[in-house]
């Protein structure tokens, strides 16, 4: 399950999305996430589904590879659905003791699960089609106006990029530690959910030690390369907008306008 996490990983390809400026993809991700909270009913669902399907198709990332990232959050999806299903007041359809399933609860559970699923998939498209270095450059360029009010944009972008880069590293490290403990007789599969959670506790100490060690190695490597922040730094490959980026911005504007118009029409 740990190896199924796709957020933070990069999938090499020569797709249209891979070639886009990272600032365009950052804006596209923001627009798509916002659109998830605008849609209502079947028409809105169809609009955001088409938007997501279009992004996945253009990315040339295999759909099976994209969807496997949902396995790691399956428990969160189930709990989200159950909470909304049983705790949303409305017209009762069925009851199980103190728990009641309502029509509003069914709709709320379905919408929340779909939104969370699409949120993860949409965010995964960004990281799967953008290298960490390009993502850092894109964030820095996009947030550059904040420099005027004293925000250390370069450092913030670097921290976000490192955090994303550490996700697959920590997942791989956790997998190694689990295999080592399984070889020593540890059991992570048997028992109920609470017992499985308790069995994971012994992983925390070696995982934290490994994380601190890797962070220290990274800090030493950055110091050895005389890294001292963004002041005076130049780029080997500076970001530059091309015609396809302008076309992508127009598509984003058309998509977001369509979602807002659809919501207003269905109100």
Named regions from a protein language model:
Residues 69-73, 77, 113, 117-120, ...:
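Loop-to-transmembrane-helix entry motif
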Residues 51-61, 76-79:
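Alpha-helical transmembrane segments and their membrane-interface exit regions
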Residues 14, 37, 60-65, 96, ...:
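Membrane-helix interfacial "entry" motifs
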Residues 1-44, 48-57, 141-151, 155-158, ...:
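Transmembrane alpha-helix interface motif
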Residues 73-186:
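Juxtamembrane/interface alpha-helical elements of multi-pass membrane proteins
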Residues 46, 62-70:
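Interfacial helix-loop-helix linkers and transmembrane-helix boundary segments
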């Amino acid at each position: 399950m740990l190896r199924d996490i796709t957020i933070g990983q990069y999938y090499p390809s020569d797709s249209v999305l891979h070639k886009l400026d990272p600032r365009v993809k950052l804006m596209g991700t923001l627009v798509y996430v916002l659109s998830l909270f605008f849609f209502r009913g079947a028409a809105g669902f169809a609009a955001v589904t088409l938007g997501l399907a279009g992004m996945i198709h253009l990315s040339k990332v295999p759909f099976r590879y994209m969807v496997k990232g949902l396995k790691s959050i399956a428990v969160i999806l189930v709990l989200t659905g159950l909470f909304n299903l049983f705790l949303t007041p409305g017209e009762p359809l069925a009851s199980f003791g103190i728990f009641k399933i309502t029509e509003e609860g069914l709709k709320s559970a379905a919408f929340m699960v779909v939104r969370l699923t699409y949120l993860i998939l949409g965010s995964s498209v960004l990281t799967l089609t953008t290298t960490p270095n390009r993502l850092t450059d894109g964030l820095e360029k996009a947030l550059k106006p904040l420099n005027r009010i004293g925000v250390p944009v370069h450092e913030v972008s670097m921290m976000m990029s490192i955090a994303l880069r550490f996700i697959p590293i920590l997942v791989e490290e956790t997998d190694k530690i689990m295999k080592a403990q399984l070889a020593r007789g540890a059991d992570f599969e048997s028992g109920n959910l609470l017992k499985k959670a308790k069995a994971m506790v012994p992983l925390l100490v070696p995982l934290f030690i490994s994380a601190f060690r890797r962070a220290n190695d990274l800090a030493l490597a950055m110091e050895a390369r005389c890294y001292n922040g963004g002041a005076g730094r130049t780029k080997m490959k500076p970001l530059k907008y091309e015609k396809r980026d302008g076309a992508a911005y127009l598509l984003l504007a058309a998509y977001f306008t369509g979602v807002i118009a659809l919501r207003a029409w269905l109100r």
